[in-house]
Amino acid sequence: MLDTRNVYETHIGTFKNSISPKTTNFREFPKWVKKLKSKIDTDQKVAMFCTGGIRCEKASSLMKKEGFKNVYQLKGGILNYFADVNENDSMWEGECFVFDDRVSLDHNLAKGSYDLCHGCRMPINSSDKKSKQYVLSLIHISEPTRRSY
């Protein structure tokens, strides 16, 4: 199973034993496919998935253009899988990143436990917020101003 999503999405959750191209954005995917082509037989079956199915359409088209003959995708993506498969029977581990204010969804399609860091715009959880590197506010007040409060 090929996870066509970006690496920060896969850190939140993915299918058991899936393969990630570890891309930071989808523009890197074509280069990864070219490398993959030199490593596996293009007749090998490739099943892929993404959040809602749109990236899989692009990814499968690209892979077919590169000569992969047996390319399949999860219809409707992860979100459709969550809706169709009982959590107890699921092969999914973790939550699913979404590109809206919810940041992540759990298997019941409810808002997950992740927030978006205001500094780096990456998903963060409660453990990340306890890190010394995490700063809640990006408003940096100079020392003289801070003393006047």
Region locations from a protein language model:
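C-terminal accessory/binding modules appended to enzymatic or scaffolding proteins
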Residues: 116-124, 130
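Residue-level detector of conserved catalytic or cofactor/ligand-binding positions
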Residues: 139-145, 149
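Short, non-ligating residues that shape and space the ligands of small metal-coordination modules
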Residues: 126-127, 147
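Positively charged, proline/Ser/Thr-rich regional signature most characteristic
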Residues: 1-44
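Redox cofactor-anchoring modules in respiratory/redox and cofactor-processing assemblies
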Residues: 64, 75-119
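Short cysteine-rich clusters marking metal-coordination/redox-active sites
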Residues: 117-120, 136-140
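Catalytic cysteine-centered active loop of the rhodanese-like fold, especially the PTP/DSP P-loop
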Residues: 32-81
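Short linker/helix segments within small regulatory modules
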Residues: 128-137
